[in-house]
Swiss-Prot record:
Enzyme class: ligase
Organism from which the protein derives: Parvibaculum lavamentivorans (strain DS-1 / DSM 13023 / NCIMB 13966)
Annotated protein name in UniProt: 7-cyano-7-deazaguanine synthase
Annotated gene: queC
Molecular function (Gene Ontology), one example: zinc ion binding
Cofactor: Zn(2+)
Residues noted as binding ATP in the record, renumbered to the chain: 13-23
Amino acid sequence: MATTEKTKALVLFSGGQDSTVCLASVLARYDEVETVGFDYGQAHAVELGCRAKLRDALTRFPGWGAKLGPDHMIALPELGRISETALTRDVEIEMGENGLPTTFVPGRNLLFFTYAAALGYRRGASVIVGGMCETDYSGYPDCRADTIAALERAICLGMDRAFTLETPLMRIDKAATWALAHELGGDALVDLIIEETHSCYRGDRSKRHDWGYGCGTCPACELRARGYTAYLAGKA
């Protein structure tokens, strides 16, 4: 992770575990880094409130402070209005009739990358980074590697500019994501992720677990908890 690439990167940064590990990974590898968040009326919007504190904390890690540039926030209220999902409505978190969980927001990652590329076009950022993962994911079709590859080609063609859509976590599971955090920033980064990132779909930060805050029963909490347990077992 010591190699630094002289390219500006723009990170999709939600304030969650995965996007925070991605941001740390990018800060370790690129000279200039900016972040972008999206407010689409998500039920777990509490994660957006974590972003500023996380960004500030990451600047204190050796060599990262000078690299982290401006943060951007894009409002996408219409996405929330047209989406009948557990993240945008009072809908039970369960498996839907279409074989996808009700937490799937159709088009979300497609829009995120497209808006980020449009911003990157103006900001001179040719690398757009997201925390999508198809190893531990919930079956979301917009988290698959082939989806991201197709979208990258479409964005490059549609904007007539070379962009790279980078997904550092695509092939690793949640335990390996915790391990990557430790590799990048040691116990300090792992502790930061536990205390300040948010994953819970219900937006619950009233309960503190070994792995962080959350309801403990939604799919996001269960995945994070299992990954943390496996990570600790791997260290033993």
